[in-house]
């Protein structure tokens, strides 16, 4: 597992995305790479077509297999259920429904949860029975919508175990699970998962043990004194909302007051920014020149029952989430006989030496391709990096081992929750827990994401 260094910052067992966005990113990135090499041959051989760079393929395969387990070879409808206000804007959900419909006997439909109906106890859409449902929101959102709109058909689908991800993952879909993995129970989990888990504690007035094994009498006061080394995050947050990072957000009192006011936060040891940074070429439009910009990276691993579906590369500031203004980055497997660092340095130097006007044309092509593919998120067009993030075949093999260990350890967490061992740490309301108990996971079809702050060999060298 030392083929790459770093930590996972969080896991998503609810409804992780990015599986189709990376497919589009690869198409755009490969075209940009070809254009860059037309300007100046770079001399680095890269593979943009490795199967794990297209995670949607494994995800769709899992959905089709889940349908076949229930319905055999019979035709059927697979529903992609998302919040009503997102139906016209989230491109990958639109593409998923279209992709499912391209298979013989399968109809994929994107819909809001209110469009489901019950007919003689069967969950249907416009009178047609539904086989499998991918739900693109977590159970807290489901419960809130149910209170407004009466979503009994969707809850019936949960009871019938038609929903992916199973709602039984929700109690362990909280960032405080890192306290379990890295705490007194660490011996029950894979060493590589434990070693990649940053020190984490539920944030409230308490005594606990610090990152170095030191006794902490008052976690709140300790956090204030050590703020530059820490991060505060909502236990169930997404898109970077509510996150406060030491140094990046220097006002410790504001961060702590926010966490205490909102409640249900975790405090986490900050992963050094240099570990998960890379230098990327960008166009400085004011100076009309090409420059290197230091960006933070995020490497999402998406895992299913059989192992890795693939990856999503993101980059930007802190946090890197697309919902917080970050972008996506093409990924490429290195085929040349050189190190990752040498490959990235050669790419950066070549792009820095290119004519600004010619590169402007490449960026315009990149933007045109993004529009053609409706490459947008809720905030609008998604930024795409000019050069790919480079990884090796050996690193992919290690990431596959990491994915298997992650799946196994999440199953251990569910077993601990079902046995009552996590009752003191899982703090979600009773109605939501009832939904979780309707559909235990137990390793059934699901997509799990781990967001890695990893260094594959191209992080900035110490100056």
What label would you give each PLM region?
Residues 1-463:
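Preference for protein termini
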């Amino acid at each position: 597992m030392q083929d790459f260094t770093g930590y996972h910052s969080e896991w998503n067992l609810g409804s992780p995305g990015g599986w189709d966005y990376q497919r589009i990113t690869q198409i755009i990135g490969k075209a940009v790479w070809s254009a860059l090499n037309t300007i100046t041959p770079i001399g680095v051989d890269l593979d943009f077509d490795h199967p794990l760079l297209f995670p949607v393929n494994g995800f769709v395969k899992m959905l089709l297999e889940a349908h076949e387990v229930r319905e055999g070879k019979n035709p059927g409808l697979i529903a992609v259920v998302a919040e009503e206000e997102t139906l016209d804007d989230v491109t990958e959900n639109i593409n998923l429904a279209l992709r499912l419909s391209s298979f013989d006997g399968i109809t994929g439909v994107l819909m809001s949860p209110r469009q489901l109906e019950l007919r003689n106890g069967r969950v249907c859409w416009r009178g047609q029975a539904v086989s499998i449902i991918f739900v693109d929101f977590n159970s807290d959102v489901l419960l809130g919508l149910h209170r407004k709109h009466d979503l009994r058909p969707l809850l019936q689908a949960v009871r019938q175990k038609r929903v992916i991800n199973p709602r039984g993952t929700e109690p362990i879909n909280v960032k405080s699970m890192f306290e379990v993995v890295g705490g007194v129970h660490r011996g029950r989990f894979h060493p590589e998962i434990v070693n990649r888990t940053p020190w984490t504690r539920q944030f409230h007035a308490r005594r606990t043990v610090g990152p170095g094994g030191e006794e902490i009498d008052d976690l709140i006061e300790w956090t204030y004194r050590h703020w530059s080394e820490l991060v505060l995050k909502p236990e169930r947050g997404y898109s970077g909302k509510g996150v406060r990072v030491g140094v990046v957000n220097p006002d410790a009192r504001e961060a702590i007051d926010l966490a205490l006011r909102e409640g249900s936060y975790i405090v986490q040891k900050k992963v050094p920014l240099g570990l998960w940074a890379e230098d990327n070429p960008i166009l400085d439009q004011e100076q009309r020149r090409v420059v290197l910009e230091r960006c933070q990276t995020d490497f999402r691993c998406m895992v299913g029952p059989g192992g890795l579906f693939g990856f999503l590369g993101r980059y930007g500031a802190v946090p890197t989430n697309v919902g917080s203004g970050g972008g996506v980055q093409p990924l490429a497997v290195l085929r040349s006989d050189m190190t990752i660092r040498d490959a990235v340095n050669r790419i950066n130097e070549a792009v820095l030496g290119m004519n600004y006007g010619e590169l402007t044309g490449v960026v315009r092509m990149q933007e045109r391709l993004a529009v053609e593919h409706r490459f947008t998120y809720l905030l609008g067009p998604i930024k795409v990096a000019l050069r790919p993030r480079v990884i090796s075949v050996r690193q992919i093999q290690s990431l596959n081992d990491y994915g298997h260990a992650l799946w196994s350890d999440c199953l251990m967490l569910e077993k601990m929750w079902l046995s009552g061992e996590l009752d003191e740490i899982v703090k979600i309301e009773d109605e939501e827990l009832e939904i979780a108990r309707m559909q235990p996971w137990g390793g059934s079809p699901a997509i799990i994401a781990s967001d890695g702050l990893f260094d594959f060999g191209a992080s900035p060298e110490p100056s």
